[in-house]
Amino acid sequence: MDEILVLVDKHDNPIGSAGKADIHQKGMLHRAFSIFVFDNKGNLLLQKRAATKYHSAGLWTNSCCGHPRVGEALEAAAHRRLGEEMGFDCPLKKVSSFIYHAILPNNLIEYEYDHVFIGRFDKEPIINLDEVSDYKWVNLLKLRALINNAPDVYTVWFKKIINGLSYQDIEEWQRLI
């Protein structure tokens, strides 16, 4: 069954709902979240999206991402997806929000009001192979070079977030968790 997601205006006020597939085919602005999980050494947990995902399949991205369902609190949805995709939960802190729009290679359209959460976890995840095909911990100082050397292997939203951060922003995130 197609998930029903929250449509929002440019101020993140709910204005309706629609099916996930319809939203991404028509490019409707909807609520989403991106989670960045760090270990105690400051490494970022990346996941490789499963090859069966209907968009951005097989691409590397942030620790977890998803959408709240209608009636579901944003942070509750973030915790739900972290467990569903990565097999663990941890305290999360919201650090920013932004709107982005991108046309994906398969003619799907991402138009999201994306809320960014950070967390800390120091064990290995137990990935759900229906969602995630691989994971790795990456040193943040090397991450931009990795993305610049092979931009096509990373999701659009992940590149947008990372490229929009200064090293001071990343250091601040580290202090917050």
Swiss-Prot record:
One example GO MF annotation: metal ion binding
Catalytic reaction(s) noted: isopentenyl diphosphate = dimethylallyl diphosphate
Main location as per UniProt: cytoplasm
Pathway terms, separated by semicolons: Isoprenoid biosynthesis; dimethylallyl diphosphate biosynthesis; dimethylallyl diphosphate from isopentenyl diphosphate: step 1/1
Active site as annotated: C65, E112
Binding annotation for Mg(2+): C65, E85
Annotated cofactor note: Binds 1 Mg(2+) ion per subunit. The magnesium ion binds only when substrate is bound. Binds 1 Mn(2+) ion per subunit.
Keyword Isomerase: yes
UniProt: Mn(2+) binding residues: H24, H30, H67, E110, E112
A Pfam family the protein falls into: NUDIX
Highest taxon of source: Bacteria
One GO cellular component term: cytoplasm
EC number annotated for this UniProt entry: 5.3.3.2
Name of the top EC class for this enzyme: isomerase
Subcellular location(s) of the protein: Cytoplasm
Gene3D superfamilies: Nucleoside Triphosphate Pyrophosphohydrolase
CDD domains per record: NUDIX_IPP_Isomerase (cd02885)
Subunit structure: Homodimer.
Known role: Catalyzes the 1,3-allylic rearrangement of the homoallylic substrate isopentenyl (IPP) to its highly electrophilic allylic isomer, dimethylallyl diphosphate (DMAPP).
The family this protein is said to belong to: Belongs to the IPP isomerase type 1 family.
Cited NCBIfam families: IPP_isom_1, PRK03759.1
Protein name: Isopentenyl-diphosphate Delta-isomerase 2
Taxonomic source organism: Photorhabdus laumondii subsp. laumondii (strain DSM 15139 / CIP 105565 / TT01)
